[in-house]
Regions:
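Extracellular carbohydrate recognition and processing domains
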Residues: 474-507
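Surface loop/turn signatures of beta-propeller and other carbohydrate-active proteins
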Residues: 1-23, 41-42, 57-88, 103, ...
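Short beta-strand-plus-loop segments that form exposed binding edges in beta-rich domains
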Residues: 513-518
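Conserved small/polar residues in nucleotide/adenosyl-binding loops
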Residues: 519-526
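Asp-box/WD-like beta-propeller blade repeats and closely related beta-sheet repeat scaffolds
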Residues: 104-151, 162-181
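Beta-propeller blade signature
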Residues: 48-54, 114-120, 201-208, 263-268, ...
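Short beta-strands within extracellular/lumenal beta-sheet-rich domains
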Residues: 394-422, 431-440, 444-449, 495-499
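Loop/turn-rich, solvent-exposed surfaces of beta-rich toroidal or solenoidal domains
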Residues: 235-273
Length: 532
């Protein structure tokens, strides 16, 4: 079988969200923040870069740790580096832009933009300084967060910012939101109210060729007020990224929906943007009219960008694991930019960067499922859910889908099916001996969905036999079945192989497993094995 690649496209023990892909020479480099597997907060690890030949996206190579949080002067008061970007300067060197933050994001809105430099795209970066004014004063105008960098034919542009809708509330000055901004942003009320438009929103600053010094004052690229504009339903939240397609500027960002990457288009880099649409949602919300209530995954933060690699455009984004926003994995999909500049929303898939569907012959990790839902999946927030629902998780080096319940749908898109095949799954029933129990610190987020309601919706009986229905459409009829019998001869920690012969259609299709029972079931790393 030829080498393939699937989502997530990096090793399954790697968690690099907030992806910024860049092609330099004959390789594409993937930059991002770095989550810890099963971590208790965002971005707990040092920056690691992966790269691949532009002509072989199945072959990703780890370039190692390229920069450590301890190299920044804010460390250890602020321990973590958030979403970065890298740009090639006019001197041929590579410049890394990032912001520091603490546990749960505290301090992430209060600091400056830091800069590091390296002679190569993925070598060892060295701290250079902060973005500053000509007199050496550190630039902290607006909210320095999620910086993105662009060398626009010799002009160095940095895009950054975040946006909440507080200031469009009619009673903003009296409802307590101003106090919230003071706390979040580390500014006085007078400083916040002193901005002509708003302290929030997507911002652009132009730098001198030294890559540090402000050349043109920071300014909004999209007005803060979104009501009665094209951005009203999908306002900017965070995750700025800019690309140039032909003579148009494409601003890619994470919206207030907090599960989708959107784009806006302009003839200019600093004004004139019109909302274009959603590129991808990590719950497929909006794709072919899908509602948020009918999302196909736990949704949550996303951040990424688009890049043309060997003539094909892709969108890079991330998915959530471990029932939180703290262990996010890089994924990618092909996209198509129409002649009129429009980008249709794409669905999340398992095949991702693969040049076509996955071969229906071999063993695949269960955790490459692109759809995982029990019909009432939660939306992530700045916390970890402790109630039970289907999720991708790990125990040591074992990575699997846990807490599968009656009606859970597990989807894989797409396979090149070739008719009748043996289809099998590696499974075990969940017990106290093998259950994943989170034992780290737990932060309560008021935005987190009601855990008691989720618990009631996921109240399951245990030790009941079940089976997987096999389907090729989300709501279609079963074309096969794999029974998962209970056996006292098998230890609670042992995985069991169950299989059956299935008459698949001879064409490209999704494969869905739907569990039938009220038991907990875990699907092992090698959940599916399709053999012609």
């Amino acid at each position: 079988m030829n080498r393939q690649v699937y989502n997530p496209f990096l090793p399954l023990n790697e968690y690099i969200p907030d992806g910024e892909p860049h092609v330099w020479g004959d390789r594409v480099y993937h930059y991002g923040s770095h989550d810890k597997e099963g971590g208790y907060t965002f971005c707990m690890q040092d920056y690691v870069v992966y790269s691949a030949p532009v002509k072989d996206l199945t072959s990703w190579r780890c370039e190692g740790i390229t920069y450590r949080a301890s190299q920044d002067p804010a460390y250890p008061e602020l321990k973590y580096m958030y979403a970065p970007d890298v740009v090639r300067g006019n001197d041929g060197r590579y410049y890394l832009y990032y912001c520091m933050g603490g546990d749960y994001g505290y301090g992430g809105y209060t600091g400056p933009i830091s800069v590091a430099v390296c002679d190569t795209p993925a070598g060892k970066y060295e701290y250079l300084g902060h973005v500053q004014y000509k007199d050496g004063t550190v630039m902290k105008k607006y909210i320095c967060f999620d910086p993105a960098a662009m060398n626009d034919d010799g002009t160095i542009r940095i895009f950054y910012g975040t946006q909440y809708g507080y200031e469009e509330e009619p009673d903003f000055l009296t409802n307590g939101r101003l106090d919230d901004e003071v706390s979040m942003f580390g500014r006085t009320k007078e400083e916040i109210l002193g901005y002509k438009d708003s302290i929030m929103g997507p911002i652009m600053v132009v730098l001198e060729d030294d890559m540090l010094t402000v050349k043109e004052e920071p300014r909004h690229i999209i007005p803060y007020a979104v009501k009665e504009t094209s951005f009203e339903k999908h306002p900017f939240f965070e995750g700025s990224s800019m690309r140039k397609v032909g003579d148009k500027y494409y601003f890619v960002y994470s919206s207030w929906q907090n599960h989708e990457l959107c784009y806006a288009v302009s003839d200019y880099p600093d004004h004139g943007f019109t909302f274009g649409g959603t590129i991808v949602s990590n719950g497929d919300v909006g794709y072919k009219g899908r509602s948020f209530e009918n999302k196909l995954n736990m949704t949550g933060t996303t951040h990424g960008s688009i890049e043309c690699i060997d003539g094909q455009w892709y969108v890079f984004y991330h998915r959530l694991t471990h029932k939180s926003d703290y262990s996010r994995q890089a994924c990618a999909e092909k996209i198509y930019i129409a002649a009129d500049g429009h980008i249709d929303q794409v669905e999340v898939t398992s095949c991702g960067l693969n040049d076509g569907p996955l071969v229906a012959n071999g063993t695949y990790p269960a955790v490459i499922a692109c759809n995982l839902t029990n019909g009432h999946m939660p939306h992530g927030s700045n916390s970890i859910y402790t109630t039970e629902f289907p999720n991708v998780t790990n125990k040591g080096e074992d990575r699997f889908i846990a807490e599968i319940e009656d009606g859970t749908l597990i989807g894989y898109k797409y396979f090149a099916l070739e008719g009748s095949s043996t289809f099998g799954v590696n499974v075990r029933y969940e017990t106290d001996a093998n259950k994943v129990v989170y034992e780290g610190p737990v932060r309560v987020d008021e935005r987190c969905e009601n855990q008691e309601q989720l618990k009631d919706a996921n109240d399951l009986a245990e030790n009941v036999e079940g089976y997987f229905d096999i389907c090729v459409t989300e709501d279609g009829e079963s074309i096969g079945r794999i029974d998962i019998p209970v056996s006292e001869d098998i230890s609670e920690t042992e995985w069991r192989w169950c299989e059956n012969r299935v008459d698949f259609p001879e064409r490209v299709h999704a494969v869905y497993l739907v569990f039938v029972s009220y038991t907990h079931l875990r699907a092992h790393e090698t959940l599916s094995d399709l053999v012609c």
